[in-house]
Regions:
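Amphipathic, low-proline, heptad-repeat alpha-helices and/or compositionally biased low-complexity charged/polar-rich
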Residues: 1-36
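Structural signal for conserved beta-strand scaffold positions within catalytic alpha/beta enzyme cores
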Residues: 48-51, 76, 112, 134
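Arginine/glycine-rich "motif VI" loop of SF2 helicases in the C-terminal RecA-like domain
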Residues: 95-105
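Conserved catalytic cores of phosphodiester-cleaving nucleases, focusing on short active-site segments
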Residues: 34, 62-85, 89-90, 94
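Active-site metal-binding core of divalent-cation-utilizing nuclease and nuclease-like domains
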Residues: 43-69
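Domain-level recognition of nuclease-like catalytic cores that cleave nucleotide substrates
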Residues: 109-150
Length: 150
């Protein structure tokens, strides 16, 4: 029985490692895409881009943060995203302002980047005013026509 438990723990550890690697791959892919010229986003030009920015007041981490003098772009990155991830994305505008009060008067735009979108998820993002960012071949496609500032 102990041997079975040990093997199950090893499988869990290995599968968790795969998931983390996929997540890191997606974050690096989208960050590099934004850093290499995709800084015109949400109809604005962003001059500073940061990845994996840690909050000062909470344990929040912001995958991709783009900044200019009046706006903040926050992009949550997932290897594979689900509709139940949308509330976390929507919460980010407030948690970012709580963590970084100097941006409290900035417009905040939200985006969701993933390597795997499905139609119902895209529709849910559109309804909430979240930008859709996805890989199509070797290109990153951004649908931000329906955006709203938070």
């Amino acid at each position: 029985m102990k041997e079975t438990d040990r093997k199950i723990d090893k499988v869990r550890e290995t599968s968790g490692s795969w998931a983390n690697n996929h997540g890191r791959f997606a974050e690096e892919y989208f960050f590099n895409s934004f850093e290499k010229g995709k800084q015109n986003f949400f109809g604005e030009k962003f001059y500073d881009i940061k990845n994996n920015l840690k909050g000062t007041e909470t344990n929040d981490e912001f995958d991709i943060v783009m900044l200019n003098g009046s706006s903040v772009g926050l992009v949550e990155v997932k290897f594979k995203v689900h509709e139940n991830d949308i509330p976390k994305v929507l919460k980010q505008a407030n948690t970012f302002r709580a963590n970084f009060p100097k941006y409290k008067n900035h417009k905040v735009y939200l985006g969701l980047a993933t390597l795997s979108f499905y139609p119902e998820l895209e529709e849910a993002c559109i309804k909430q005013g979240i930008a859709i960012i996805k890989q199509v071949g070797e290109t990153v496609v951004i649908n931000d026509k329906h955006l709203k500032a938070f």
